[in-house]
A protein has these predicted regions:
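Glycine-rich phosphate/ribose-binding loops and adjacent secondary-structure elements
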Residues: 1-145
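C-terminal extensions of enzymes
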Residues: 110, 134-205
């Protein structure tokens, strides 16, 4: 059982966390600005709600209070405009040990759509490959970094994979490898070892 909530003030966040604890749910996802939960359309996503870093810091403090009072803190997932491996690392560290996952929406939809468009362009639809893509190559193997990896894994079946899925795979692999590098550099050999000791603020604000 999971609940997803948006970039709301501390009172509402406290209610969501406490009620999730009381109901013994499996996961509470907290989507900070500029995330999309309850904040669409675009203008609201970019300008309304509590920014993710503040919202997620509040979530940590509220979970700490729950635990000190003998209550169970629910497992958390953080979301809110994340798009790269350093975002994932910092979110997990900021919410440790309560944050167990990081959610992404638009960051993964975009490569999926680019891959889907590339599939049409490679069939010479919509004017063919634009220069922004053709500078990387003119075939699937040249355009998609991990196409050969998928070919080695799936053999001839790779030809049936939608290029939107291939684009998504490329970005997820990039995030995975980047996160592994950050974890190795910080001496965290498992995701569960990432802690708040691994991050610090560069300014008092």
């Amino acid at each position: 059982i999971t609940l997803k909530t948006g970039a709301y003030p501390m009172r509402e966040l406290a209610m969501a966390i406490r009620w999730s604890s009381d109901a013994d749910i499996d996961l509470l996802t907290i989507d900070g600005a500029p995330g999309g939960t309850g904040m669409s359309p675009w203008r609201m996503m970019t300008e309304w709600g509590i920014p993710a870093v503040y919202l997620h810091a509040m979530a940590y403090e509220l979970c700490e209070r729950l635990v000190k009072n003998g209550k169970r803190a629910p497992d958390l997932a953080f979301a809110g405009g994340f798009s790269s491996e350093d975002h994932v690392f910092k979110a997990l560290a900021l919410g440790a040990p309560y944050c167990k996952a990081v959610c992404m929406g638009r960051a993964l939809m975009i490569p999926g759509m680019v891959g889907k468009n590339a599939e049409r362009w490679l069939r010479d639809e919509d004017g063919g490959l634009p220069k922004t893509v053709s500078k990387f190559g003119f075939t699937k193997e040249e355009i998609f970094m991990n196409y050969e990896v998928l070919k080695a894994k799936y053999g001839e079946e790779v030809e049936d994979l939608p290029l939107g899925a291939v684009g998504l795979y490329n970005v997820v692999d990039k995030i995975k490898v980047g996160l592994q590098q950050l974890m190795a550099g910080s001496r965290n050999w498992k995701v569960g070892y990432i802690s708040r000791d691994d991050i610090f603020s560069l300014s008092t604000e």
